[in-house]
Amino acid sequence: MRFRPIHGFLAVILFAGIVIVADMAIDGRFGRPPYERVAAGPDGQVRIPLVGLEPRQVRFFHFLNAANQEVWFFVGRDAGGQLQVAFDASEVCFKRKRGFRHEGEWMVCNQCDKSFRLAEINAGGGGCKPVPLQHQVVGGELLIAQADVLAGWRLFH
């Protein structure tokens, strides 16, 4: 069988596909939870309804404003029902942009695999722990000021 130009083209395409899939696997893009898209309203507040957020449950969010500033964060309820809100990044591992995953009562860093109790997220602590996000609850709604969300933008650009 003779080597034809189409064979070289197919080999390049196959190799590129393998490289892309390997890069995605290394960066942890497979198996990540879906992010819900949010934006600030005219009042400058990001509003998230808390209906259906059960204890030991975490929801992940993606904020994008008109200036294309992207910020990822999560909202969860610990076993005691307390709300925990933090950026999906830590002070130590933020450069790899891999974030955290939720496992039961724990948040686990996708970069270094360190685990942190969901109930202790709002307390902060630095290091590889998720960076807490200022918030308030009014009625059944979580309110986060756009300025507070953008304060964490440095972790994502």
Predicted regions and their residues:
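Solvent-exposed loop/turn segments at secondary-structure junctions
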Residues: 107, 115-117, 142, 150
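Iron-sulfur (Fe-S) cluster-binding segments and ferredoxin-like electron-carrier domains
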Residues: 96-103, 114-122
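Short cysteine/histidine-rich metal-coordination sites, predominantly Zn2+-binding motifs
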Residues: 104-113, 123-135
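Surface loops and adjacent helix of pleckstrin homology
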Residues: 88, 112, 119-121, 147
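C-terminal extensions
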Residues: 58-60, 119-126
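Hydrophobic membrane-insertion alpha-helices, especially the h-region
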Residues: 4-24
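N-terminal pre-ligand scaffold of iron-sulfur
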Residues: 24-101, 132-157
